[in-house]
Amino acid sequence: MSARLHAALQFAVSAHAGQDRDGEVAPPYACHPIEVMLNLRYTGDVDDEDLLIVGLLHDTLEETPTTPVGIESAFGPRVGALVQELTRHEPTAAEVAGVKKDEIWKLRSGMLLAEIEKMSADAQVVKLADRLSNVREARIAKSAAKFARYLGQTQSLLEVIARKRNPGLWDAVKAEVAR
């Protein structure tokens, strides 16, 4: 592992310190970005160090007080831009005022898929590695109904991201959906 990748690993672990993932047996949050990076490297055969670093940092802007400037100054403009590109945008309070939970989920899902469709090829590759990690965890952590809904969203994601982006990751996500 290069010094730069090691620094990104330490950055991610530190940024997510004290956070846990969802579920009854919630692992430390840092396990997720590490899995995303490993998915990129070993399932996706990605050896682009910037993308591996983005895999480690992809949730830092939305889940921690980390700033875009902090990421860019530590890891460069390409990493900073990709992490920003992967950061979800949430509906405004006005958009969800008086809206039922299921309808909010549909709104957020539609927003996410629209964002993914506009992402760069590199960001879409990281998104596939992220979704692979998330769908595996969701199988264990979500109720049957929520997991079924999540699988539907994942199938839509596979329709938005072309298989040619990264056949190894795309096929792995598809296999999880079919499982």
Please report, for each region that a protein language model flagged, where it lies by residue.
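Active-site helical microenvironments for divalent-metal-assisted chemistry
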Residues: 1-179
